[in-house]
Amino acid sequence: MSMQDTLADMFTRIRNAQMATKETVTMPSSNLKTEVARVLKQEGYINDFTVTEGAKPQLAVTLKYFEGKPVIEHIQRFSKPSLRSYKGKDALPKVADGLGIAIVTTSQGVMTDRAARQAGVGGEVICTVF
């Protein structure tokens, strides 16, 4: 059986690992997952990530906790394979009144909603994180 929504699987694995207070979580790797992990690290939501090469590349994400609680309180898929959500630069969502981020895939790469607004581009809103 093939996996239909690999990003939703990534977010579910992160949520489940944080509920179990795991230090790291591994999952099958893809270019898009690696870019999402890069944005999460850049914004301080995870400690680090590594990609192991091979026949089946794996992405290992090192989770981040603050005083025993997960830094990522909420991570949710926004645009789904069954219902894609594209937004212009002015319509990009503000997550938790600007305290969270929306991860957007644009023509200039994967970036946060703030970076997309600064670059003046819109795109597909992948997920929201706070």
Swiss-Prot record:
GO BP, one annotated term: translation
Keyword Ribonucleoprotein attributed: yes
Taxonomy, superkingdom: Bacteria
Keywords, comma-separated and alphabetical: Ribonucleoprotein, Ribosomal protein, RNA-binding, rRNA-binding
Cellular component GO terms held in the UniProt record: ribonucleoprotein complex; ribosome
Keyword Lyase assigned: no
Molecular function, one GO term: structural constituent of ribosome
PANTHER family noted in UniProt: 40S RIBOSOMAL PROTEIN S15A (PTHR11758)
Membership in a protein family: Belongs to the universal ribosomal protein uS8 family.
Known partners and oligomeric status: Part of the 30S ribosomal subunit. Contacts proteins S5 and S12.
Function (record text): One of the primary rRNA binding proteins, it binds directly to 16S rRNA central domain where it helps coordinate assembly of the platform of the 30S subunit.
Protein name, per record: Small ribosomal subunit protein uS8
Gene name as annotated: rpsH
